[in-house]
From Swiss-Prot:
This is Matrix protein. The M protein has a crucial role in virus assembly and interacts with the RNP complex as well as with the viral membrane. Associates with phosphatidylserine (PS) and phosphatidylinositol 4,5-bisphosphate (PIP2) at the plasma membrane. Interaction with PIP2 triggers matrix protein lattice polymerization. Matrix proteins induce host membrane deformation and curvature necessary for virion assembly/budding. Homodimer. Dimerization is critical for virion formation. Interacts with host ANP32B. It holds the Pfam family Matrix_Paramyxo_C. Gene3D superfamilies: Viral matrix protein, C-terminal domain (2.70.20.60), Viral matrix protein, N-terminal domain (2.70.20.50). Keywords: Host cell membrane, Host membrane, Host-virus interaction, Lipid-binding, Membrane, Viral envelope protein, Viral matrix protein, Virion. It comes from Measles virus (strain IP-3-Ca). It is found in: Virion; Host cell membrane. One of its GO terms (cellular component) is membrane. It comes from the Viruses. One of its GO terms (molecular function) is lipid binding.
């Protein structure tokens, strides 16, 4: 049984949207580098120099003898660094990087990124750029199947997204807690609906709401659980959620991210599951990579956030992690 509770628009109205990166080109057709700065916080951090950096660009053939052939559009999350440089200065150095891209495979397909030239302004992000980093291919590339293996590839930076970390603490919930299930508990999740504003040309955006596509994603917050074997009612859980005083914002962590701040009283069990933190960040890159890629450059606006209450462990379902073929019986065997 699923119960849905709508949050009031005022709880995300201030910072519930992200500005677009409008593509403009040079006379030869090359994209003009741009930087976008987002601040989803409330500004209570004393040091304002911490920021999250996310690069967008083209994966193309690294051929010095001829014009590069673009293969796919990709991203490179650099993570958090501390810098007093201007965004335009950081963008200029990023466009001068020589980032090598390699396509590999493990449990799934992955992309490897590493940079060759020395760094100056981007030194706070040297660990990712110099040592190299590996990402699931679908998280950072819109068409990994088009990237060849027999031709050297490079990542040419075109856009930069900076998210200022002005809140006093940004925290990601431990992954184990996101998968934690408990009998006789009520799972508290959020269903977020975004409206995507499409660019139809330089400086032009479709603003007619009837023509705009929508994207939804769901995040797991935690579980309401009683000490006894009884289960909380949906009305009781809704009351607890209202007392939390949740405020929502959109940021650019990993592309697009949902930022949540509790300004009220939080259920003790739920608070413990969240690491006793009241400022949370859920990157869409980890939650649902398809809409995240769609939103890399688009303007998006939050139009609805709903609390979803579901049984923590549905009794009618079993959860299987792996399915293999049993050679002895010639049948599928579930482990």
């Amino acid at each position: 049984m699923t119960e849905i509770h709508d949050f009031d628009k005022s709880e995300w109205d201030i910072k519930g949207s992200i500005a677009p990166i409008q593509p403009t080109t040079y006379s030869d057709g090359r994209l003009v580098p741009q930087v976008r700065v987002t601040d989803p916080g409330l500004g209570d951090r004393k040091d304002e120099c911490f920021m999250y950096m996310f690069l967008l660009g083209v994966v193309e053939d690294s051929d010095p003898l001829g014009p590069p052939i673009g293969r796919a559009f990709g991203s490179l999350p650099l993570g958090v660094g501390r810098s007093t440089a201007k965004p335009e200065e950081l963008l200029k150095e990023a466009t001068e990087l020589d980032i090598v891209v390699r396509r590999i495979a493990g449990l799934n397909e992955k992309l490897v990124f590493y940079n060759n030239p020395p760094l100056t302004l981007l030194t706070p992000w040297r660990k990712v750029l110099t040592t190299g980093s590996v990402f699931n291919a679908n998280q950072v590339c819109n068409a990994v199947n088009l990237i060849p293996l027999d031709t050297p590839q490079r990542f040419r930076v075109v856009y930069m997204s900076i998210t200022r970390l002005s809140d006093n603490g940004y925290y990601t919930v431990p992954r184990r807690m996101l998968e934690f299930k408990s009998v006789n508990a009520v799972a508290f999740k959020l269903l977020v609906t975004l409206r995507i504003h499409k660019a139809i040309g330089p400086g032009k955006i479709i603003d007619n709401a009837e023509q705009l596509p929508e994207a939804t994603f769901m995040v797991h917050i935690g579980n309401f659980r009683r000490k006894k074997s009884e289960v909380y009612s949906a009305d009781y859980c809704k009351m607890k959620i209202e007392k939390m005083g949740l405020v929502f914002a959109l940021g650019g962590i990993g592309g697009t991210s949902l930022h949540i701040r509790s300004t009220g009283k939080m259920n003790k069990t739920l608070h413990a599951q969240l690491g006793f933190k009241k400022t949370l960040c859920y990157p869409l890159m980890d939650i649902n990579e398809d809409p995240n890629r769609l939103l890399w450059r688009s303007r998006c606006k939050t139009i609805r956030i709903q609390a979803v209450l579901q049984p923590s462990v549905p009794q009618e379902f079993r959860i299987y992690d792996d399915v293999i073929i049993n050679d002895d019986q010639g049948l599928f065997k579930v482990l």
